[in-house]
């Protein structure tokens, strides 16, 4: 089994749970524009938010307007408080390729920016999705492991499990730091395409996000049983 099949099988088994298991609160306080978010659950509302912010981004006439949207999505919605103004301005002024060329540096932030700049093309890469992709490869003992850079998480379970599997993960084949994000996008899109039923790469991203703790613990237990 390869990584794509492992993720595809996981997605087939769990895509029906996405509306109930994906949880991320939306607080529109401090949002510089007025939006009416629709949806019956957290998943639908967050998808709607992403695309409405994209529309507002396209309608923005000035750098300041674009900056305020990107800052809100990273800082307020995403809860990433570590970026200074200069960094957020860089994420606003840079082209998508310039951001991708930064590699893993700041990816949990700049991939959020890309996901509203062009949600048709891009998706978020953060500590939870990184853990899930690596965990699935351990759980299913895929034929050719691919290294996806682990990131520091605010979640204690994910950080603990990351430490338990890091020796194994570090041995895997590594893409160039400037290339793995595109590999990640391609993987999500291929799985969504094979899944059918109008699934998108955002759905696969959100599945990985939602199941991160469960997959992390399964991978850590699997790894410990092999030791």
Annotate each predicted stretch with a short phrase:
Residues 78-83, 121, 137, 212-216:
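Short alpha-helix boundary/capping elements
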Residues 94-118:
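Helix-hairpin-helix
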Residues 88-94, 100-101, 146, 150, ...:
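Catalytic cores of nucleic-acid editing and processing enzymes
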Residues 1-29, 127-132, 140-227:
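C-terminal accessory module of base-excision DNA glycosylases/AP lyases that mediates lesion recognition
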Residues 62, 101-102, 117-121, 172, ...:
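Conserved aromatic-histidine-acidic binding/catalytic patches
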Residues 41-44, 48, 65, 104, ...:
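Alpha-helix boundary/N-cap detector
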């Amino acid at each position: 089994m390869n990584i794509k099949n492992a993720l595809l099988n996981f997605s087939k088994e769990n895509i029906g749970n996405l509306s109930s298991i994906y949880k991320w609160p939306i607080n529109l306080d401090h949002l510089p524009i007025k939006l009416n978010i629709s949806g019956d659950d957290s998943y639908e509302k967050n998808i709607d938010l992403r695309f409405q912010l994209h529309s507002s981004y396209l309608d923005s006439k000035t750098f300041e307007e674009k900056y305020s949207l990107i800052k809100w999505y990273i800082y307020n919605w995403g809860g990433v408080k570590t970026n200074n103004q200069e960094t957020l301005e860089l994420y606003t002024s840079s082209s998508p390729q310039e951001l991708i060329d930064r590699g893993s540096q700041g990816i949990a932030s700049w991939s959020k920016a890309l996901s509203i700049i062009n949600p048709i093309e891009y998706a978020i890469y953060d500590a939870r999705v990184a853990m899930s992709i690596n965990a699935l490869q351990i759980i299913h003992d895929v034929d050719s492991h691919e290294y996806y850079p682990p990131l520091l998480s605010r979640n204690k379970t994910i950080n603990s499990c990351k430490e338990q599997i890091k020796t194994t993960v570090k041995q895997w084949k590594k893409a160039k730091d400037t290339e793995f994000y595109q590999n990640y996008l391609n993987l999500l899109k291929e799985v969504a395409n094979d899944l059918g039923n109008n699934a998108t790469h955002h759905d696969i991203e959100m599945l990985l996000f939602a199941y991160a703790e469960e997959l992390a613990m399964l991978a850590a237990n699997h790894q410990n049983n092999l030791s």
